[in-house]
Amino acid sequence: RQRQMCIRDRVYTDNDWTDNERPDGKNIKFMVDGNELNAWETVIYYCDQLKVMNYKLEPEYETNFSIFNEPSVENIFTIPMNKTLYTNQMQYLFRSRHYNHAKAYGLSGENGPSATIETLETFGYGTAAQDPRFDICYFAGEMYDLKGDIIKLDDGTVLVYLPWEVALDITDTPYEQTAGARMKKYEVDPTATKDGKLMENDIVLFRYADALLMKSEAKVRNGANGDVELNQVRSRVKAARRPATLENILSERQLELAWEGWRRQDLIRFGMFTRAYNSRPQLPNEETGYTTVFPIPEKIRVMNTKLVQNPGY
């Protein structure tokens, strides 16, 4: 928790998030084991402690998301899943897959969340340089069931996910059922119950690869070189080496941590959250950064009349 707090120090200590300025992590100090460290040095220190605790990268990326993934030496914090002992449910997979795709696995689906155009571009989808993690994280193209048989739509045509047809609103378009690359990442548990939401794969919240990318980022922000940590993550999937610039680190976090719930926080930390991209327009006055935080609910302000609504709302 300390390393995650410190990597976001400039956000947490920013009293005015609408002035386009952030505190400098080099000037934010912590006492760590009797030593005064700045925010970035603190991140590096705690990430190194994970290595001392014998956390490491799994040789195979997908091992972290397999059925019965408890033995992973990379996963640090997970939500335990067990059909007998717990009632936790994984909603993401259920929401993303097409109805017939999920049905072919004996599950159910909502035909929902898909990869954005920006995500496809970051992964290099469809190019010779496509990142190896795309096929692990996303379903795209023709779909097959667990026995290898083709999956069809209700009209008898083959179910083909079309990643580039994704848009904010595809209602009443020819691609209403098939637009977008869908969430994959977790190995399909054929014994899952509750329409596939109660599975044996533990839900991964934080793992060592994330810590390595945090360390790389902290080193760069502190004026050092973070190439080793960035390329340690990339070499695991045999991706080409890259220099550890902030732009490349943010890109790598999207590649490595897809569907793991960090993107919004990352974009805020890198000052990219309020920009327009692809078909997502910038909201009125969003250049001020006001959407970095949520509005205070009106019922809370009624309970405490001294609270002033956050700027922009």
What residue ranges belong to the model's regions?
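Extended, well-ordered alpha-helical segments in internal regulatory regions
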Residues: 8-23, 210-224
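Structured segments of extracytoplasmic/periplasmic soluble domains
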Residues: 14, 46-56, 215, 219-222, ...
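Extracytoplasmic/periplasmic, Sec-exported soluble proteins
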Residues: 31-42, 69, 200-208, 222-225, ...
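C-terminal substrate/ligand-recognition segments
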Residues: 132-233
